[in-house]
């Protein structure tokens, strides 16, 4: 089996090294990742300039583009490697709730899913760098189960690993997406020339961390698995919308 691996933190990140190392014990691996951190770019494509594919000394390939670009490159240019699965991550920081709309990590998996390839996004609910041992141990558990009976149809799973010691991981829970409050996150500043500039600041606080959500269960020490879908149609609103637009 062949697994294409990407991320949004870049090919030099600790998370992608862990993901590639563990996955290589179960399958053939090829890494195609952005050359630098592309967090928050979602499913964007690079359309205004050409892309370059290069190979690093560690064997990883990197692209001067987005995670979505990397999936297209990875599936298009290698005659000797066609992915059976796509793994994205391990992201340095959670991708839960609304985060999934912005995440390049989730976007790489989403793009693969749109191509008909089963895909999984992995994230660690920590940005301090203290819990990579937990992430690696969790990954061994997850992939041993995954490859024992691999999914046969396209799936899109979002997995978050808790920020606890390896021995304190409480198991795996299937969870729905939670929600964040919208952050007031535009921060004004001045550049060295005195010109007005703006920074996009931190995300908002979590507003839905109830039991059964990814925020709630991962915060309680569980690995969370959330099945995602691409169809954004609000089916319960179809009749009401039709009544509005078809009214005399």
From Swiss-Prot:
Pfam families the record matches: SurE
Family: Belongs to the SurE nucleotidase family.
Name by which UniProt lists this protein: 5'-nucleotidase SurE
Cofactor binding notes: Binds 1 divalent metal cation per subunit.
Binding site residues for a divalent metal cation: 8-9, 39, 91
Keyword Cell membrane in annotation: no
EC supergroup of this enzyme: hydrolase
Any GO MF annotation of the entry: exopolyphosphatase activity
Compartments, as annotated in UniProt: Cytoplasm
Catalytic activity: a ribonucleoside 5'-phosphate + H2O = a ribonucleoside + phosphate
Source superkingdom: Bacteria
Chain ranges passing through the membrane: none
Keywords, alphabetical: Cytoplasm, Hydrolase, Metal-binding, Nucleotide-binding
EC nos: 3.1.3.5
GO cellular component: cytoplasm
Listed cofactors: a divalent metal cation
The organism of origin for this protein: Neisseria meningitidis serogroup B (strain ATCC BAA-335 / MC58)
Free-text function comment from the UniProt entry: Nucleotidase that shows phosphatase activity on nucleoside 5'-monophosphates.
């Amino acid at each position: 089996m062949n697994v294409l691996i990407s991320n949004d933190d870049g090919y030099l990140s600790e998370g992608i090294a862990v993901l590639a190392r563990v996955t290589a014990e179960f399958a053939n691996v090829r890494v195609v990742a952005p050359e630098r951190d592309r967090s928050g770019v979602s499913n964007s494509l690079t359309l205004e300039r050409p892309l370059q594919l290069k190979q690093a000394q560690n064997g990883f390939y990197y692209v001067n583009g987005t995670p979505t670009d990397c999936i297209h490159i990875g599936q298009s240019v290698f005659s000797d490697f066609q992915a059976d699965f796509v793994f994205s991550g391990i992201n340095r920081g959670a991708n839960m709730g609304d985060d999934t709309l912005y995440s390049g990590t989730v976007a790489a998996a989403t793009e693969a899913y749109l191509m008909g390839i089963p895909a999984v996004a992995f994230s660690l609910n920590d940005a301090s760098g203290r819990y990579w041992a937990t992430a690696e141990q969790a990954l061994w558990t997850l992939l041993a189960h995954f490859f024992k009976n691999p999914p046969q149809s396209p799936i899109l799973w979002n997995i978050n690993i808790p920020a606890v010691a390896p021995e304190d991981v409480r198991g795996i829970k299937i969870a729905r997406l939670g929600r964040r409050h919208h952050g007031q996150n535009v921060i004004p500043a001045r550049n060295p020339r005195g010109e007005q500039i703006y920074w996009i600041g931190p995300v908002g606080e979590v507003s839905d961390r109830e039991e059964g959500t990814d925020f709630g269960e991962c915060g309680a020490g569980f690995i969370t698995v959330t099945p995602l879908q691409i169809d954004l149609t609000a089916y319960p609103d179809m009749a009401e919308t039709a009544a509005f637009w078809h009214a005399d």
